[in-house]
Amino acid sequence: MGIANKLRLSSSSLSRILHRRILYSSAVRSFTTSEGHRPTIVHKQGLDILHDPWFNKGTAFTMTERNRLDLRGLLPPNVMDSEQQIFRFMTDLKRLEEQARDGPSDPNALAKWRILNRLHDRNETMYYKVLINNIEEYAPIVYTPTVGLVCQNYSGLFRRPRGMYFSAEDRGEMMSMVYNWPAEQVDMIVVTDGSRILGLGDLGVHGIGIAVGKLDLYVAAAGINPQRVLPVMIDVGTNNEKLRNDPMYLGLQQRRLEDDDYIDVIDEFMEAVYTRWPHVIVQFEDFQSKWAFKLLQRYRCTYRMFNDDVQGTAGVAIAGLLGAVRAQGRPMIDFPKMKIVVAGAGSAGIGVLNAARKTMARMLGNTETAFDSAQSQFWVVDAQGLITEGRENIDPEAQPFARKTKEMERQGLKEGATLVEVVREVKPDVLLGLSAVGGLFSKEVLEAMKGSTSTRPAIFAMSNPTKNAECTPQDAFSILGENMIFASGSPFKNVEFGNGHVGHCNQGNNMYLFPGIGLGTLLSGAPIVSDGMLQAASECLAAYMSEEEVLEGIIYPPISRIRDITKRIAAAVIKEAIEEDLVEGYREMDAREIQKLDEEGLMEYVENNMWNPEYPTLVYKDD
């Protein structure tokens, strides 16, 4: 009886065997004709073969092999032979060491990244336990600022593929390609097209590193199960001529698709992933401004998605701005009275402006007058200077924040006024940098901030990576004194004043918010990520610090508390989803059960659904 059972095959197993025999016979004919040798028979497909050091060829798998072995989408699109692979490895290794000295302030950052990456390859549970237990030390290694250097040198660092690659050449194939990913359930996708990686510009297919790093933080901070995350690169080409002309570049060596051709690729990708994983949350990351806003508006009311550059950066900045209000000893409701000069009108800058306007307007009653009043608190300066209604060909996204020409004339300003001129005349409470221009807040600009009408002015140098920060904390504190508030997008060390006092360098990292937004959306079952859910996340972060901490100039908590911060933000997001009647349930918890949870119950619900890196007991079961 036992032998009979072993010999009995299911119809699906028989179909797979017959299919493989057909592929084998065709492979024999093909290989024998063209290369004069028989193929090696393998019993693995997809990621299994990529993770087998004996059979893995990496980028040398031909397109025929990729289709035959279910590898399509699991490798960068450019096919290379072994000689090209060796040349790429040696060339990029040397280039990598040369560029490392211009990278993060920690000269060992790249070496640490490599060691962590090797651990990730060997033992995922141990990797995340190390990351969680040392999050303050290693978050800057797996994410900003080190990840910027990783992306710049991705082809040299590429060893084992992570995530999926969808390219312009895969049009019409994506619906089947998603099934090459082995996970039956995916909770979180981070997707990029590589067009605007941090402040480094168009890095093409190398941008996959930012998606990998972001998802590491989803696992470490939010407890998303690492078997249910998927980093994705959508390769539509690159306008980076240096990359495009590099024979060792791993991506498509063509200019970026534009207009409807571009939209068609993204549409097909979204339809494919939501067909296979209907409940997945997709975070868009580092898309250039013109597409970041268009895609957000195109998908946000249909899919569970958000854009971290537009909405996440905005949320963290709002939390910091509200913290700056508290640091002045004022209630957060005074936020609409703050005068803010914003340097930068890209996706991040406009995202912050929109979020700040909505927050102010809500505090003022959400009337049309409230929106007008809120809008009047911002002065936006881009590469061409102050944006006013007199500007020609103004970006539609920046249009609502263009100042009235006559009003500016009364203030002694005009279209194109410099940042220094604007700061001198406006005397703002806050100078907010989202320009990606390192050193933009020059000595002259910071000197002008001395005229601020605020009792405790704030400097937010939020651009990443470190070299793109508008100024350093040392620059700001040395000119404005120890009473100011400082925040940045990249990590800096606190400034010692020599009198026992410390200038706190608050890092306004997006990792404070996006893990909680993602986790809260996931556990609520909300079909969309609403503005209210995003605002709830910001206000939760702003209220996290104690009064004593805020008065000391600490407006963001230490990264070491990230699991607790994320848990509270996720609970706040779920609570807002309940109030907006967006809750649809998660797994065994239906909507009615979630709606009954009080604040303590929500916290417990979130904590119980956060993955922890512990070794499970394994039991073998024969198929």
UniProtKB/Swiss-Prot annotation:
| Classification via SMART domains | malic, Malic_M
What GO biological process terms are annotated to this protein in UniProt? Answer: malate metabolic process
Q: Which residues cross the membrane?
A: none
Q: How is its activity regulated?
A: Activated by oxaloacetate (OAA), 2-ketoglutarate, succinate and fumarate as homodimer and by OAA, 2-ketoglutarate, succinate, fumarate and coenzyme A (acetyl-CoA and CoA) as heterodimer NAD-MEH.
The UniProt site entry described as Important for activity is assigned to 309
Q: What does this protein do?
A: Involved in the regulation of sugars and amino acids metabolisms during the night period.
What is the official name of this protein in its record? NAD-dependent malic enzyme 1, mitochondrial
Give the species: Arabidopsis thaliana
Q: What taxonomic ancestry is recorded?
A: Eukaryota, Viridiplantae, Streptophyta, Embryophyta, Tracheophyta
